[in-house]
UniProtKB/Swiss-Prot annotation:
Signal peptide: none annotated. FAD binds at G9, A10, G11, L12, A13, G14. PROSITE patterns: GIDA_2. GO terms for molecular function: flavin adenine dinucleotide binding; tRNA (uracil(54)-C5)-methyltransferase activity, 5,10-methylenetetrahydrofolate-dependent. Catalyzes the folate-dependent formation of 5-methyl-uridine at position 54 (M-5-U54) in all tRNAs. It comes from Listeria welshimeri serovar 6b (strain ATCC 35897 / DSM 20650 / CCUG 15529 / CIP 8149 / NCTC 11857 / SLCC 5334 / V8). It comes from the Bacteria. The keyword Cytoplasm applies. GO terms for cellular component: cytosol. Its EC number is 2.1.1.74. Keywords: Cytoplasm, FAD, Flavoprotein, Methyltransferase, NAD, NADP, Transferase, tRNA processing. It is found in: Cytoplasm. This is Methylenetetrahydrofolate--tRNA-(uracil-5-)-methyltransferase TrmFO. PANTHER family: GLUCOSE INHIBITED DIVISION PROTEIN A, METHYLENETETRAHYDROFOLATE--TRNA-(URACIL-5-)-METHYLTRANSFERASE TRMFO. The gene is trmFO.
Amino acid sequence: MEKSVNVIGAGLAGSEATWQLVKRGIKVDLYEMRPVKQTPAHHTDKFAELVCTNSLRANGLTNAVGVIKEEMRILDSIIIESADKASVPAGGALAVDRHEFSGYITEKVKNHPLVTVHTEEVTSIPDGPTIIATGPLTSPALAEEIKQLTGEDYLYFYDAAAPIIEKDSIDMDKVYLKSRYDKGEAAYLNCPMSEEEFKTFYEALVTAETAALKEFEKEVFFEGCMPIEVMAKRGIKTMLFGPLKPVGLEDPKTGKRPYAVLQLRQDDAAGTLYNMVGFQTHLKWGEQKRVFGLIPGLENAEIVRYGVMHRNTFINSPTVLEPTYQLKTRDDLFFAGQMTGVEGYVESAASGLAAGINAANFVQEKETIVFPAESAIGSLAHYITSASKKSFQPMNVNFGLFPELPSKIRAKQERNEKLAERALDAIKKVAEQV
């Protein structure tokens, strides 16, 4: 019997997954509801439409997103192939002519003899091997079906996330490790502020520029957590009873309680990333760097994921997904793209690539592959399936997700080059297997 896989959604992840399947001789039934039913963000009927920016971000190997793109080139990604063909001048970044980019992918995928395209909305998950790659604007009917399948609590609609910072960039001389009232182990890094420092920060925060909301995001703006800048505008002391509450956080150096304290919580298993507790925000990214850099200890903080606020639909991957992108409770069902909690065009396509390869292996009765954590593709799969279940939020690829090198290298560029070299060596070994 001919082996086949259903792929739901022809965005970046679904198109890439489809390509990886047909490359391996697997027939694909590809379902895409556009243009019969449009989303509020899409404008065309093309596959892999870029709805926001036309940039696929940095191209160099001293940047994690450059590394993941190179890994995808090694694994014959159609998304990166198309991006390279449709590229436009953008300094050290890979930016594309968005029409040429999605046009090329649509033509290659649609016209492949093993692909059957179904232009219809899918409202229930089909039987048999299936990849769900329906993105952050998944239609309500299918979202409800996924919710039933993954468990009531495991489909999140979120509208806020706090920034995540690289631990190495925090000034450890200015912060201290402590949990409130010394309960349990000392689990938080604490950034103490004097009254003067707090007032300087407060003034900068309430006058900072926020990012514009897209029309389709407005309805969900205030359904979730309150942005820190909105809280601050309610009064100068509001934050002191909220995220900056100093009680129980006396500074061990002075024995005194600071005027205000920002807590940083470990965000990954390796302890290389920390998030700003309660600091979900909609400030522009440049403003986040400027304003949050006024907090003692964060003057030179490297923000690996900026605080964001927009509508999104994603499953609680640490609870429900394997690092192979398979559902724990149904091994012939794979998820890919932003729905898994990867953030960004390239990351979505990379997850589609991994899910496509693994779905092909599954139907051919071969072993599915857990991509090595040393690779960018593997580090992302590892993060989304092993992060904190309670506070899971979407993540871009970044070097903070990679396992540390055996010996510490202080120079950032040299360290990143070594991480990149190790990642590409790991992915070349995967390429030999698949």
